[in-house]
Amino acid sequence: MVELRVNAGNVKNPNVHKIGIIALGSHLENHGPALPIDTDAKIASYIAFRAALESGAKFLGVSYPAHEIKEINHGIHVSLDDLTNEIVNVLKSAKKHLGISSVVIVNGHGGNLPIVTKLYDIEEQTGLLITLNSKIIESEGPHGGSGELSMAKVLGIINEDEVKNQTDLSEYGEVGLFMFSEARKNDPNIEEGAMDIEENGVYVDEVYGNELLKLAINSVLLDVEKQLDSHYGY
């Protein structure tokens, strides 16, 4: 067997090769007229890839399906069990072919948050240490709002001609999850976001977008460091 030069390149600790970073977003859901339907997947992928570049960890790509709570219907999603099974299969393959032993999941879609209840099952089925990072969801604000618009500006995926129509909530009620009254009733955070969009509208600020992305990337880098420290004695 060939001996790999695990210290080659800009690698601070060769154990980082045992860590994978995978993006988890949503490819098929509406975000208003200014943002593509795969906004969450692209933002999560960017964060995961940049963190992999900076840390030296393995970039494992992006998971295809996504989950959503039943009160919200703005796209095509799968059950939590189906999402769990997909993640398990992808991570088993990564473990087999790349020899990883831990993973950071970079989640960019709020509907995937219930996956936290399945992390123990995923660890048991894969034999991997799993960290779920949802920092960007905690930081970006309402669905299709200024945070996502500003990050989309940085990534070059925004249609700026349509920003003026982003808050036409009679036509694009998914923005801020405004149209989903049951979800707003059940979740104060969703209600707050919907009211913010209705009352304050949206804006695009490239500096803000960069700040959000850097905050999320640094959070993932910290998770990688924690895995190195706890799992590999770094």
PLM region descriptions:
Residues M1-D81, N85-S102, G110-Y234:
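Extended, histidine- and acidic-residue-enriched regions that form the cofactor-binding/catalytic faces
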